[in-house]
Amino acid sequence: MPINPDAVGAKSDPTRSSWTSKDALLYAVGVGAGQSPLDELQYTTENSADIDQKVLPTMAVVLGFGGGFDKIGDFNPAMLVHGEQSIELHREIPVSGEIETVGEITGIYDKGKGAVVVSESRSTLVSDGEPLFTKTMSAFIRGEGGWGGDSGPALEWEQPDRDPDETVTYTTRPEQALIYRLSGDRNPLHADPTFAAMGGFDRPILHGLCTYGFTGRGLLHALCGGDSSKFKGMYGRFSSPVFPGEDLTVNIWRTADGEAVYQTQGGDGRVVLDKGTCSYTA
């Protein structure tokens, strides 16, 4: 087993990254904003009358890569599957800016047939040195378990026994993955039919983080009235691939003041993003 379970606590070197107004607009279109051209203009345009450009909160996932996976030892990247993703917004993301990011390995768990590695990335805005957002992701690495280590904490999540308080449905476009990849994730699994076939798919699949972005838009509008300053964070567990062109339905239950849980379903009703939570200013 080439990965090192003792790498917990290892940190990456600080890295800097920047983005522009154009990057924010492209990300928004990449997660479906603008399909109704008169809606969401604050996220899809920079020059509409009496509208100030804003940044979708989930854009945090494509900014600042400092995961620290280079600290855990050797493994086959093809065996890595993105399992969970969370973001915590400390304030609104500006339309353009530069951040410094440090990643830390916060957990390595033995799942028998594989290992789960948890990484936290903290990003600060270079202009003032203050925190902007924190991201946590977990990855399942097949074939790297079996050393007798801790299996990790169990996630406590319960779907309320009632109809959703809010339901939002979006349609992904056939070329959605080709648009989303322009925000940085050029994995050929999402564009190259030959590569997708090697993974057992008959055509390229949508990025999991694109599904995450669509879901974040749904939460933003249903819970925050479209106001990005009220969106504080979200978590979700990837449970099934999505194909471009599918509908995505976000079922949302309010559970407390400023808190909600959700599930996102594909067009056939299967759950594609599970055990979701969202925090916001009510």
Regions from the PLM with identified roles:
Residues 7, 18, 40-42, 54-61, ...:
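Residue-level preference for alpha-helix termini and adjacent loops
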Residues 36-40, 48-51, 126-130, 224-228:
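Intrinsically disordered, low-complexity coil segments
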Residues 1-13, 63, 80-168, 242-245, ...:
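HotDog/MaoC-like acyl-thioester-processing domains
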Residues 2-46, 155-211, 218-221:
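A contiguous, surface-exposed recognition patch within enzymatic or periplasmic domains that forms
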Residues 1-98, 279:
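Hydrophobic, proline/glycine-rich low-complexity stretches
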Residues 189, 194-272, 276-277:
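Catalytic-pocket segment enriched in acidic/His residues
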Residues 30-32, 96, 114, 145, ...:
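Glycine-centered flexibility sites
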